[in-house]
Amino acid sequence: MGRKLKIDTGEPKLGPYTPGINVKDHIWLSGQIDIESGDDIESQTIGTLAKIDDLLAAANSSKGDLVKVTILMVDIGFYTKVNEIYSEWLGDIIPPARAAYEVSKLPGGALIEIVCEAFRLSLIHI
């Protein structure tokens, strides 16, 4: 196994965890939330995706390397709006595998949390 590297952009955390771990070309991002950008699903989703972009960049990666995404929402009624924002964020890259769930609560009163896994240089153009 390669050396385990911490991925961190210095953002405040709500617990004892590392925002991301990188081993060789495999990248795992802890669940990301954004409660600073606003209290609505649109601003929190956009802010959370921006945090993911920043963490992936810190690992010399990008959203094109994502292979698995898990989305947690406190209201499944957000699903359509989250999909619109997520689709726009992805652009024309191959979408990663994904699951989305409704949960009763998230840390800090967040409305959405997104967990990601990536393999650096996995971007394939069709």
Labelled PLM ranges:
Residues 1-67, 73-123:
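N-terminal presequence-like segments and the immediate start of the first folded domain
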